[in-house]
Amino acid sequence: MKKTLFVACCACAALAFCGRAAANVTFGITEDTGALGDPTMFYSTLNDLGATENRIAINWDPAQPTTIPNQPGLDYWLPQATIHAVRVLFAVAPAHPGDITSSPSRINQFAAFLQQLARTYPFVKDYVIGNEPNQPRFWQPQFSSTGANLSGSAYEPLLAASYDALKGVDPSINVIGVGLSPRGNDNPFAKDNVSTSPVRFLHDVGVAYRASKRTKPLMDELGFHPYPNQNNDPPLKGYPWPKAGIPNLDRIKQAVWDAFNGTAQPVFAERGKTAPANALKLDLDETGWQVAIPAVLQNLYTGKENVVTIDEGTQAQYYSDIVRFVSCDPDVRSLSFFHLVDEQPLDRWQSGLLRLDDSKRPSFTSVKNAIAQTQGKCALTPPGWSHTATVNGATVAFGYLGSPKGWNNKLWRFRTTVQEDASYKAGVFKLGSRKLTAKAKKAVLKALANPKSKPLLGAKGTALAYKSKLVALPKKTLKRSGWYVYGIRLAAAMNPQRAFVSVSRPFLVKSRPRARK
């Protein structure tokens, strides 16, 4: 039943849009050197799987700024990647969360290290810059002591310097930005895991980029890690805004558009428009679901499990489904599973296609079959994406307005809901007649859009995602009887140029009774 539902959702998504041609999605494994103990066996296993990419993490330590970690291992392994036609990606990140922000010289040192890597391994053409900098485990500080976000604005100059450094060595190098975590609580005063959501992190990178007046891009692709929120969540469950998962990739694309549209940084191609040659692509370079260890193999693992695991059959289904799902997204260039082989400590990752004894899980066969069947292509017309110019999920309920309101009425209110944070400006507007003419509506909309205009009984505020907001106007009487309307303009917090406006039906305010003589 789960498989039928997932495939049906993929088909419906494909049929719902006018698609565009896209290059095939490629598949890979996020695994450092040492898996299976031998590079020939490792890359032969990737060939058997149908995986053509291997993302390798390289941690830069400012205490040894020119030392390439595990260089003998890389020198031993990487030639086999070339022999087996496996594309290697280096994911280069600071070894400690405060390495970049603790000294003004660190960005230049990091950029110089990237150039050293590029000259040492000229056949490696893909670099991921950083690893989940929206998470405190990998980047600190996330916020200032007053609660202002710092991580996005501090990461932007690192990405810019990295782009320039790598392109200076070889313009054909593919620079992959960010490597975003799908999560983030946006709470600078949280008890733990003080982190930044992916949508807000991209927004802050964009603000810093625009402020820098940079005339060159920051990245060629965007790295994103669409892990589930809870390990036992199915792939299509996703996240609420401003987080994102497998089914929320359009949310990431919109965040990029909000952050960079109109700048030198390319955004994602859009449905119905000719895709520019340099349109941004998604590199989904980490995802995985952890599984329960069979009793006969538990002696190979150490420690205690720290997540709710799924069974191996469910993992196999999820992985196969994901291959098919991303194959129908023309903006995805690649997907990599984390890992090929389990990690030994149970509080780490047992998400591999192989168990710790190197035996194959059912997911190995399911992924192999899915790659072979799809070839990274969509069975139907691939869906496309286009940016929205409005506020996602915005609705307004003005309530019943069919009865006249008394001259002494002081209660003016209605409700609005949104699926992303938004600011609002609202008020009451006088009409010249009982009808809301096109001219009158235009005047209301113009007043709402003008920051200097002051509607009758005006109010401003913030509507939070997924929470019904009571828009309460000042408790005053209207001086004149006649016909009125409510009006509200919502502006997206991530891009105030995206707006939603709504005007109520006209309602009558009765005149004050004449005093008896």
Question: What name fits each language-model region?
Answer:
Residues 41, 45, 65, 133, ...:
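Aromatic-rich peripheral "rim/lid" segments of glycoside hydrolase catalytic domains that contact
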